[in-house]
Swiss-Prot record:
Annotated family: Belongs to the influenza viruses nucleoprotein family.
GO BP terms, alphabetized: symbiont entry into host cell; viral penetration into host nucleus
One Pfam family recorded for the sequence: Flu_NP
Complex formation: Homomultimerizes to form the nucleocapsid. May bind host exportin-1/XPO1. Binds to viral genomic RNA. Protein-RNA contacts are mediated by a combination of electrostatic interactions between positively charged residues and the phosphate backbone and planar interactions between aromatic side chains and bases.
Compartments reported by the entry: Virion; Host nucleus
Name of the protein: Nucleoprotein
Keyword RNA-binding: yes
Gene: NP
Keywords annotated in UniProt: Capsid protein, Helical capsid protein, Host nucleus, Host-virus interaction, Ribonucleoprotein, RNA-binding, Viral nucleoprotein, Viral penetration into host nucleus, Virion, Virus entry into host cell
Region feature Disordered, mapped onto this chain: 1-21
Keyword Ribonucleoprotein: yes
Residues spanned by motif Unconventional nuclear localization signal: 1-18
């Protein structure tokens, strides 16, 4: 990206640091995941989980959700002011699964939030360690991205369900900070802005008074985050228009939807980080690995290496395919829900199938599901190669548009063409080029028309052997150019419901 110089790296955003050198970044990210690991071990001790139960991904998710809930200030305050029946605002909990006489049992646990916060701080040298909390939020967000499609949410805001590849991070909580903003897709930002504008249209006090001033600041900040994701001058200029509007309304919504569509070809830069379940960090810490001393990166070989040596289990429903369950979690671990399946398959070393062909539901088990028939199996989270995660949209040479498939947001920095159906996308751009943004719209459409699907993105970038930790010998894969590689293609995934 043109303006990369002023940006902090992911890891700095993730750890709340000022500009640091590579070694300091690796150390502070290591400190962050080490803290998560120590917290997890302590929780397993508190709950008296066996080694096997501690490696169960469902137990990991429950423990992660408890700590996130314990630190959710706004919700805690809300719960205390609006007491609801049967909800104790000072307690948090969830299902813990235990192995009893060859069967899995569900046990609902309840803990004081204060106690959970104490354990978390103790594991993090007495600090609140917000970076670690954000890291867990991003892992949950990546899991949701791989598991559910957001068709309904897209349609509700007037966007097209085919824009699902722009929806990375759509389930991240608002409090996820700069690290959270970095991983949000263009569609996610557009949807948040449209919701805001719609509230302003329906509620005339929304932009007024002291509260309205704060709302306005939030609106402009979100516009700037979205602007920073676009890589062409025309798209950025349109974002300036949207941000500066005196009274945001339908014209701004139109502009935002136009921009979201344009991002299918002129892709935005969206960060990708491999965030792993807490139990994986716990296993490593328990085996004596010192993350802070060794250093850690979310975008290099480290997460791949960690997954090579971790054995994680998952509960499996009667008619689910364990291999598909493994694929789902693998994609979540590497933030690869919107990556081209050809690239994912090559890196993973086994064929990655589209969502519609998978026989598996989500990882979490609902409280009304029957435990009698539950089995468990090992998740296969290893990979054949590793590759560097990208934060660019894979557009060829900075300012020019590159081909974008109707549903790919690249995760790995690996050379490939980005096949796309230009006719399908361009059909969405008929008509409306009048109004104050007409010259920008015309310019954007011209760039999109000039994009060629055969253009190669990430020229010369390849994958690496797992023994090649310094990334010295890139292996540039050759892909079947005609093969369309979208995960949500022809899909029947469940909708995401809060």
């Amino acid at each position: 990206m043109a303006s990369q110089g002023t940006k902090r790296s992911y890891e700095q955003m993730e750890t709340g640091g000022e500009r640091q050198n590579a070694t300091e970044i690796r150390a502070s990210v290591g400190r962050m995941v080490g803290g998560i690991g120590r917290f997890y071990i302590q929780m397993c001790t508190e709950l008296k989980l066996s080694d096997y139960e501690g490696r169960l991904i469902q137990n990991s998710i429950t423990i992660e959700r408890m700590i996130l809930s314990a630190f959710d200030e706004r919700r805690n305050k809300y719960l205390e002011e609006h007491p609801s029946a049967g909800k104790d605002p000072k307690k948090t909990g969830g299902p813990i699964y235990r192995r009893r006489d060859g069967k899995w049992m569900r046990e609902l646990i309840l803990y004081d939030k204060e106690e959970i916060r104490r354990i978390w701080r103790q594991a993090n040298n007495g600090e609140d360690a917000t970076a670690g909390l954000t890291h867990l939020m991003i892992w949950h967000s990546n899991l949701n991205d791989a598991t559910y499609q957001r068709t309904r949410a897209l349609v509700r805001t007037g966007m097209d369900p085919r824009m699902c590849s722009l929806m990375q991070g759509s389930t991240l909580p608002r409090r996820s900070g700069a690290a959270g903003a970095a991983v949000k897709g263009v569609g996610t930002m557009v949807m948040e802005l449209i919701r805001m504008i719609k509230r302003g249209i329906n509620d005339r006090n929304f932009w007024r008074g002291e509260n309205g001033r704060r709302t306005r600041i939030a609106y402009e900040r979100m516009c700037n985050i979205l602007k920073g994701k676009f890589q062409t001058a025309a798209q950025r200029a349109m974002m300036d228009q949207v941000r500066e509007s005196r009274n945001p309304g339908n014209a701004e919504i139109e502009d935002l939807i136009f921009l979201a569509r344009s991002a299918l070809i002129l892709r935005g830069s969206v960060a990708h980080k491999s965030c792993l379940p807490a139990c994986v960090y716990g296993l490593a810490v328990a085996s004596g690995y010192d993350f802070e001393r060794e250093g850690y990166s979310l975008v290099g070989i480290d997460p791949f290496r960690l997954l090579q040596n971790s054995q994680v289990f998952s509960l499996i429903r009667p008619n689910e395919n364990p291999a598909h369950k493994s694929q789902l979690v693998w994609m979540a671990c590497h933030s690869a829900a919107f990556e081209d399946l050809r690239v994912s398959s090559f890196i993973r070393g086994t064929r990655v199938v589209p969502r519609g062909q998978m026989s598996t539901r989500g990882v979490q088990i609902a409280s009304n599901e029957n435990m009698e028939t539950m089995d468990s199996s090992t998740l296969e989270l290893r990979s054949r190669y590793w590759a560097i995660r990208t934060r660019s949209g894979g557009n060829t040479n900075q300012q020019r548009a590159s081909a974008g498939q109707i549903s790919v947001q690249p995760t790995f920095s690996v050379q490939r063409n980005l096949p796309f159906e230009r006719a399908t996308i361009m059909a969405a751009f008929t008509g409306n080029t009048e109004g104050r943004t007409s010259d920008m719209r015309t310019e954007i459409i011209r760039m999109m028309e000039n994009a060629r699907p055969e253009d190669v993105s990430f020229q010369g970038r390849g994958v690496f052997e797992l023994s090649d930790e310094k990334a010295t010998n890139p292996i540039v894969p050759s892909f079947d150019m005609s093969n369309e590689g979208s995960y949500f293609f022809g899909d029947n995934a469940e909708e995401y419901d809060n």
